[in-house]
């Protein structure tokens, strides 16, 4: 196969080091995929240039194998409207060569992402009634449209699509982490139940699309999360649902420019995106995708309208939502209670789906609408953090 730089009649060795793309680092101690990297091309990279670059990458695959790097090469390719890139296993010499391509914007290690759940215990649900009553109450008040005609992409650990809570409205979309179309942690099923379950859900008529990116330990590589976002955008576009879709990511990890950039593409495409702020009681600015300013980043509140002790905070937070002792669906049937910002984010996704159906707003305008409806009721929200609590605008 003819190499990319042979086609263009010059070689990598001839490139000036001043053109080298930045190789980003991750915080000390962060868990990463061994020799795993994410490569993001510059915004002005044409489809032709990207294709040629991939041809060149394929041509050096055998060289990496000969150097003893087993399983080397490109694993995932990303082709968003405004983001082109790929991820894979590469040795140090290859990464240096890649970074010297003037079309490459940056390279970063492929860090491990985790779900944002902290505890499980059995207690009665309260989140639905709280988000539909300004001053609290026992009943969930909502319009009968209930998210009808809206799709909810749950980018998580999988979903038990046969659970009675979903009434046949849940389907498998894509599995990007293993070959098991099941929810090994219960996390994704719980999240989906909060968004669209018949009993525990907010948008009770919305369709759930399971996009599995986390394994049975609740972990997955950043590259897989980006692939899940890419798949969701393409799937929604194919079905004409971009502006009638919500995408929830109750997960996070160390800061990733690539993940933030990919997440922003979903909003640019027309979708609503909710993400969890994190459970370390720190400023969420250092986490991804929570630090991406265009997404709806959700912190966790308690039954008494306080900040949950574990919840992250900071200027990246858009809203608080119920995230303590939340009852929802469990794989195999039945229910379970979980706490975490992982439980707060799907409340926002559910209300967004509800408002998209009820008011006809496009998905990428829903976060603004949520903030317009929200109430400034959270006590001690944290430094430089909003005090606004999610509300569905029921009038109660």
UniProtKB/Swiss-Prot annotation:
One of the GO biological process terms: proteolysis
EC primary class: hydrolase
GO molecular function: serine-type endopeptidase activity
GO cellular component: extracellular region
Keyword Protease among record annotations: yes
Active-site residues, Swiss-Prot/TrEMBL: 156, 187, 342
Alphabetical keyword list: Glycoprotein, Hydrolase, Protease, Secreted, Serine protease, Signal, Virulence, Zymogen
InterPro entries: PCSK9_ProteinaseK-like, Peptidase_S8/S53_dom, Peptidase_S8/S53_dom_sf, Peptidase_S8_Asp-AS, Peptidase_S8_His-AS, Peptidase_S8_Ser-AS, Peptidase_S8_subtilisin-like, Peptidase_S8_subtilisin-rel
CDD domains assigned to the protein according to its UniProt record, in alphabetical order: Peptidases_S8_PCSK9_ProteinaseK_like (cd04077)
PROSITE patterns with a match to the protein in the record: SUBTILASE, SUBTILASE_ASP, SUBTILASE_HIS, SUBTILASE_SER
Inhibitor I9 domain residues: 37-113
Taxonomy, superkingdom: Eukaryota
Keyword Glycoprotein belongs to the record: yes
Subcellular location, record wording: Secreted
Positions annotated as propeptide: 21-116
PANTHER family, alphabetized: ALKALINE PROTEASE 1-RELATED, PEPTIDASE S8
Function summary: Secreted subtilisin-like serine protease with keratinolytic activity that contributes to pathogenicity.
Protein name: Subtilisin-like protease 5
Lineage: Eukaryota, Fungi, Dikarya, Ascomycota, Pezizomycotina
Gene encoding the protein: SUB5
């Amino acid at each position: 196969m003819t190499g990319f730089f042979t086609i263009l009649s010059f070689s990598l060795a001839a490139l000036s080091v001043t053109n080298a793309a930045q190789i980003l680092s991750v915080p000390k101690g962060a868990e990463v995929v061994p020799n795993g990297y994410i490569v993001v091309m510059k915004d002005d990279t044409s489809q032709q240039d990207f294709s040629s670059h991939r041809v060149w990458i394929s041509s050096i695959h055998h060289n990496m194998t000969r150097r003893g790097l087993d399983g080397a090469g490109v694993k995932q390719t990303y082709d968003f409207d405004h983001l082109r890139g790929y991820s894979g296993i590469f040795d140090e010499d290859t990464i240096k060569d890649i970074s010297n391509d003037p079309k490459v914007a940056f390279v970063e290690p492929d860090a491990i992402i985790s779900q944002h759940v902290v505890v499980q215990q059995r207690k009665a649900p309260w989140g639905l009634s709280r988000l539909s009553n300004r001053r609290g109450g026992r009943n969930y008040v909502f319009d009968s449209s209930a998210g009808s005609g809206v799709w909810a992409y749950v980018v998580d650990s999988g979903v038990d699509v046969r659970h009675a809570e979903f009434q046949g409205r849940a389907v498998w979309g894509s599995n990007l982490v293993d070959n098991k179309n099941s929810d090994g942690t219960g996390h994704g099923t719980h999240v989906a139940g909060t968004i669209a379950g018949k009993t525990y859900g907010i948008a009770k008529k919305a369709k759930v699309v399971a996009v599995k990116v986390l394994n049975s330990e609740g972990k997955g590589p950043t590259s897989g999360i980006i692939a899940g976002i890419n798949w969701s955008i393409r799937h929604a576009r194919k079905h004409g649902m971009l502006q009638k879709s919500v995408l929830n990511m109750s997960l996070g990890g160390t800061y990733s420019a690539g993940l933030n950039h990919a997440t922003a593409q979903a909003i640019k495409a027309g979708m609503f995106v909710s993400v969890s702020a994190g459970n370390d009681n720190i400023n969420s600015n250092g986490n991804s995708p929570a630090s991406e300013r265009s997404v709806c980043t959700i912190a966790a509140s308690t039954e008494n309208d306080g900040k949950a002790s574990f919840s992250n905070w900071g200027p990246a937070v858009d809203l608080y939502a119920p995230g303590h002792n939340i009852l929802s669906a469990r794989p195999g049937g039945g229910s379970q209670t979980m706490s975490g910002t992982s439980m707060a984010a799907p409340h926002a996704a559910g209300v967004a789906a509800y408002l998209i159906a009820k008011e006809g707003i496009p998905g990428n305008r829903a976060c603004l609408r949520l903030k317009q409806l929200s109430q400034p009721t959270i006590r001690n929200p944290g430094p430089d953090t909003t005090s606004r609590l999610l509300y569905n605008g029921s009038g109660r």
